[in-house]
Amino acid sequence: MPPRCPFLRHLFFLLLLLSPWIMSPCGGAADDVTYPIVPSSPGRRSILQIRREPPTEPNTKLVVDRDGKVFLKQQPKETPYWSFSTGSPMHSLYQAPANNNTENATEITRPHIIVEYLNNSKAATTVDGYHNWTVQEFFRQKPLVTDDGVTLGSETTSAYLVDGRSGRLIHVYKSTGDTKITNALVKPASTEDFVNEPLLIRRTDSKLEHFSKTTGKLVWNLTVSHFRAALLCDPVFNSGYDLGPKLQTGIYMPLLCGSQIDVRGPEIVIRVLHDQPMNVKMLPSPSLNHFESENSIMPFGKARESRKLQEQHKQKYTYLFGQWSPVKLLAPLVLLGVVVSVFIKKFSSRGSDVSLKAGPSKKKKNRKSAKDTNRQSVPRGQDQFELIEGGQMLLGFNNFQSGATDGRKIGKLFLSSKEIAKGSNGTVVFEGIYEGRPVAVKRLVRSHHEVAFKEIQNLIASDQHTNIIRWYGVEYDQDFVYLSLERCTCSLDDLIKSYLEFSMTKVLENNDSTEGVAAYKIQLDSLEGVIKGNNFWKVGGHPSPLMLKLMRDIVCGIVHLHELGIVHRDLKPQNVLISKDMTLSAKLSDMGISKRMSRDMSSLGHLATGSGSSGWQAPEQLLQGRQTRAVDMFSLGCVIFYTITGCKHPFGDDLERDVNIVKNKVDLFLVEHVPEASDLISRLLNPDPDLRPSATEVLLHPMFWNSEMRLSFLRDASDRVELENREADSEILKAMESTAPVAIGGKWDEKLEPVFITNIGRYRRYKYDSIRDLLRVIRNKLNHHRELPPEIQELVGTVPEGFDEYFAVRFPKLLIEVYRVISLHCREEEVFRKYFKCDII
């Protein structure tokens, strides 16, 4: 017998001694008294505190009335706690006027359809000549062909983001894109944009339209609305006992955080004339799922199912142990656990001794830690609100089946162990697959759930924009929150460094190990397909059209965020991601510390929580001053400088940047060869936030103009100053000519070829120190390019790119100096509005 058998024998005798005491009841029938199972979720009391009040039902409920107004009501008195309107009634019915003027008309035609609301105590009555349908039965029949026409169905969805505590309407999402209705519904709010209990009410309007088979005209249409609610907060906000977050003392939300429920409304019966058959010649089409069955779209929240499971546990508990005192039950179980743990310890130690003596194993086995096992066994909280796309909530199981073993499944997410990037506060980004699509999985420590859900809220608000990273869903386990985000190729920082072939000597100078160098080579190799065939700089260091396009993408993303009232607050090259489709595009990401301002707010105040990254923050952020949208514009200036100069910073090296930002010690020498960039960056880095341009103004800056627009502006400017009289002391002409030393740098004929000067001298005389005369030359040669001699055409190049480059190389500061004068004196004139107004460009 093996040496550990005596220990097993002792354990067996001990269990025999304990078994009579364990199995004998204290008296009384086992079915008389039951004890509820205590949930083992974090933050609740231990099993020693098992005596507690039984869980109570929610004392509030969400309902909707006939007018489409959603209420949170306290039970049992049905007292409204808050309410908001969704803008239109629950149902609408239109019936075309009947034609009763024909010769055969003997009686007034009855309506095809009658819609009736039922009270709780009223049953659906029958009406002669009509057949009663429930909403589910009626809408399940679409589309169809009847003897008198065709019935078609459609569906639109709206989502209303509400503060669950106050009922304040935060935002409206409409699949129809009706921004006028959206703006009319949302009232300005002065409170903090982030709320702990964001409640999303989804309204689905299902519409049937019946058209006459003979005339093709609309006979009738019927629209009925269905409401669904999802509470988007983290489950840690739940109050326990299967109750949602507490609104005030004794009042709780009717659903748990992360769950969804139907919003109940008045019951409707639809009466249809018998001569309107509803069950013939069905046309193939997807049904209106939310009318098929309540569980086919979204099961009810966890509260109801968990109570059923709890009742089953209570029965098993009573049947197995009888009417036992919890303390008497606990003592032998604890003792038994101690004995078993001692046994396991001895067994494992002896087993390890044997394995050491036997030598190393020939076959390694994959073993998972207890922590990983727990993560895999953690049930998926409740019906999670996974995805908003085009205003609709998309649910369902993930059909993805991966043969990969290097990862694990969390709800709908397959999380790979391959790490993409690391961030602050324990944030790590992994590869993953969510509902069959490759995603980047941002893993945040669960204690930072506010950051995660704030990021989700702002990603939802800014969804569907090509320059904002897409959010697909969220999953949880015991320790982390997992955000499934759009998968991109690399960051802007990686792209620039890879393109410049960030040398190995630079890596070695930073004291990286040989392994680090090897890893960086792998990174460069992985991006070779992205940078191959793309040019980011022209000869001479000017940004290429592709680089300008990427920087314009960044600005477009900021414009979109600022229009929504969202301030990013952490803009830097690492948070700009690059996506490769037909061409490269830039997308803003990492909105964990972003803030959303209501419409009547101009700033975030002096104590806005969270801070951006060192070296990329505006001075008012570093000094904890009043923060506005201008903080993003300062960071944008640093990013543009960093991109154009190839990873250089306008405020110096890493350690000195914050100090230099506060002292306004900026060095723009490296971009002075690109005057348009130098002008824009200097304005963006202005220490006074009120003097920085807005995102829309940046988008219209000459730095982002193409050759055609640059030439068009110079031609319009020439036309404008051509009629000005020098003797009349023209302000605009004086301002224009005063910039000549900078814009021209001497006499402009000295910078043009003799053959070109000879050609223009045939027609008129010019003043070679005058900007007006130089603009006249550019305008005339541009307007008559086809009539120029072949040698002159070859010299100035093709229109517009070649022609623009010819003069831009010789007079690099001409455009920006003329732009400044026109901006100051003529920006409101009709001819120049397209260069300064976003609604025109």
Curated annotation (Swiss-Prot):
Residues 1-30 form the signal peptide. Residues 31-323 are lumenal. Induction: By ER stress inducer tunicamycin, by salicylic acid (SA) and by bacterial pathogen infection. It is a single-pass type I membrane protein. Gene3D superfamilies: KEN domain, Phosphorylase Kinase, domain 1, Transferase(Phosphotransferase) domain 1. Changing residue 442 to A: Loss of autophosphorylation activity. It catalyses: L-seryl-[protein] + ATP = O-phospho-L-seryl-[protein] + ADP + H(+); L-threonyl-[protein] + ATP = O-phospho-L-threonyl-[protein] + ADP + H(+). GO terms for biological process: defense response to bacterium; endoplasmic reticulum unfolded protein response; immune system process; mRNA processing; protein autophosphorylation; response to endoplasmic reticulum stress; response to salicylic acid; RNA splicing. Residues 414-704 form the Protein kinase domain. The kinase domain is activated by trans-autophosphorylation. Kinase activity is required for activation of the endoribonuclease domain. Its cofactor is Mg(2+). The chain crosses the membrane at residues 324-344. InterPro entries: IRE1/2-like, KEN_dom, KEN_sf, Kinase-like_dom_sf, Prot_kinase_dom, Ser/Thr_kinase_AS. Glycans are attached at residues 100, 104, 119, 132, 221. PANTHER family: IRE1-RELATED, NON-SPECIFIC SERINE_THREONINE PROTEIN KINASE. Belongs to the protein kinase superfamily. Ser/Thr protein kinase family. This is Serine/threonine-protein kinase/endoribonuclease IRE1a. It comes from Arabidopsis thaliana. The lineage of its organism: Eukaryota, Viridiplantae, Streptophyta, Embryophyta, Tracheophyta.
